[in-house]
A protein has these predicted regions:
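Conserved hydrophobic positions within beta-strands
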Residues: 45-47
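Short aromatic-glycine-enriched beta-strand elements
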Residues: 53-64
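N-terminal secretory signal peptides that target proteins for export/translocation
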Residues: 1-9
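Short boundary/loop segments of OB/S1/cold-shock single-stranded nucleic-acid-binding domains
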Residues: 26-41
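OB-fold/S1-family single-stranded nucleic acid-binding modules
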Residues: 107-132
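Short, structured beta-strand/loop micro-motifs enriched in basic residues and often containing a Trp
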Residues: 26, 77-86
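Bacterial N-terminal signal peptides
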Residues: 11-22
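Short nucleic-acid-contacting surface segments enriched for D/E, G, S/T with interspersed K/R
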Residues: 85-102
Length: 138
């Protein structure tokens, strides 16, 4: 036999548990929380590493700054590899050692050498990835 009082206690508890799980999930996907979308810049660097893994694609660049010093940058497209694959993008499209440019990049709020990018081209301007929706321009 069902206990109506027991069910009444379970409902608020289940609702609270659901909401507590949702808060970190929303924070994880808050681009404006991690990146300063009011600041836009471009980087030019040599690809040193590519992390083609969920939840988001990350790639690493050696970038020569204005003082001639090499800085290591880590950048993300904000997309997961499965979505990029469905859009026709392949890991092989960005070979290690390639000189690439990031387009419409936004820096990390913590002032680390981290950014999210809106597009990637090779140094000669050949587009690789455009937009943050997993679109390929090849």
């Amino acid at each position: 036999m069902l206990n109506p009082a027991g069910n009444m206690l379970k409902t608020p508890f289940m609702l609270a548990a659901f909401l507590l799980v949702q808060i970190p999930a929303q924070a994880h996907h808050s681009i404006t929380g991690e990146f300063d979308t009011a600041v836009t810049f471009e980087l030019r660097g040599t690809l040193t590493k590519l992390d083609w893994a969920n939840p988001h694609l990350w790639y690493y660049l050696d970038v020569v700054n204005d003082a001639g010093v090499v800085e290591q940058w880590q950048c993300t497209t904000g997309q997961n590899p499965n979505r990029l694959i469905r859009a026709g993008w392949k890991k092989e499209d960005l070979p290690i050692g390639s000189v690439i440019r990031t387009l419409r990049s936004n820096p990390a709020r913590d002032e680390s050498n981290t950014c999210i990018v809106g597009g990637i081209t090779f140094d000669d301007g050949t587009p690789v990835f455009s937009g943050n929706k997993g679109e390929t321009t090849q």
